[in-house]
Amino acid sequence: YQPSGVEPDRYGVTFTEDRAEFVRRDGAITTILEVIVSPENDAEVRRVSVSNAGARVREIELTSYAELVLATPAADAAHPAFSRLFVQTEYVARMGAILATRRRRSPAEPETWAAHLAVVEGEETGEPEIETDRARFLGRGRDVRDPIAVMDGRPLSNTVGTVLDPVFALRRRVRIPPGRTVHVAFWTVVASSRTDVLDLVDKHHDTTAFDRAATLAWTQAQVQLSHLGVDPEEANLFQRLAGHLIYAGPGMRPSSGTIRRGGGAPPGLWSQGISGDLPI
């Protein structure tokens, strides 16, 4: 039930090859979160669909939140605070998008630009709000379970520029009549220049962009499964195994004593069919 930890009346999670889907029901309100990675662009969409099964009009406030790094996982793990010092943010009001870039420390370092935007299908109320300062969003001594910007009902500060700990946060307020559903798609896109990232923002700032990404993701998933000759159940097992290989989960690792006993010279690998001619 992340991030709030509040148990709903009903909850369900479905992972498929093309998307992840989270469904929860709280009273008369049902929320569906669909997460899809675009096959054609460096873009991810998280669409929130809110349905009102009650007898009265509801006004719902939706707030996104993501912590920014714009660096490799290794660089962030080694020096997380230092890595984030070089991120600058700005807001492009005409597109309703937050932009962020990492200041290069040398001309040889490649540019990295990211953008975050929201596309609303339904009736909006109030003005869009943004935040790019993590401290202002979370508050002193708080975390994502109880951020002050959400729990206290205060507006976002619309802070941009050079911040010590950057985030992407967008807020939209929607009005949902009885028996109706409103969709809000939160897009995050990445490119190698400001011009390119603005082009991606323009491309995805449309209500049809989600359907296109969903169709392409499903099609690509079916083609991959057919090409590999595996069914969805087998693909799920392979992905779980790949996760342990890529991220080296400690729970799957033998004890240090077992690893030391397995040490030896390269000839010890030859009996296993591993050599310079047949590398891993």
Tell me the role of every PLM-derived stretch.
Residues 1-280:
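Anionic coordination/interaction segments
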